[in-house]
């Protein structure tokens, strides 16, 4: 079933993915939220440490977008959006930082902006 999205200020009013992506913000200036977010399956949690960042992103995106985007297309969008490193750097024991500035513009927004652009292009 395709995902529907609602405004945080008008929870009873739903739009489809296309409208949510192309409008960006609802007319009431809320934020679009998915109606449902399915939990990640047990096999994901059993194997997540062995997955790449794009693989993790794809698994999460499937739970959010459901059938709104064909799975093969969604996988392509995610892999094209996160095709640069995001190293987890250890600062000291039990203290780490995820560096999100290794993309084309050297800013954390590269992940989201690239994903949004590819989703809009789809």
Residue ranges and their predicted role:
Residues 1-122:
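PLP-dependent amino-acid enzyme catalytic core
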């Amino acid at each position: 079933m395709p995902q529907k999205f609602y405004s945080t200020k008008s929870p009873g009013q739903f739009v489809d993915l296309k409208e949510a992506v192309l409008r960006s913000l609802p007319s009431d200036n809320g934020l679009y939220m998915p109606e449902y977010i399915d939990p990640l399956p047990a096999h994901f949690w059993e194997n997540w440490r062995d997955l790449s960042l794009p693989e993790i992103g794809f698994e999460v995106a499937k739970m959010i977008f459901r059938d709104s985007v064909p799975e093969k297309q969604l996988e392509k969008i995610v892999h094209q959006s996160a095709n640069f490193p995001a190293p987890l750097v250890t600062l000291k024991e039990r203290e780490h930082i995820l560096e999100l500035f290794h993309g084309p513009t050297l800013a954390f927004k590269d992940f989201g902006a690239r994903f949004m652009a590819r989703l809009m292009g789809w």
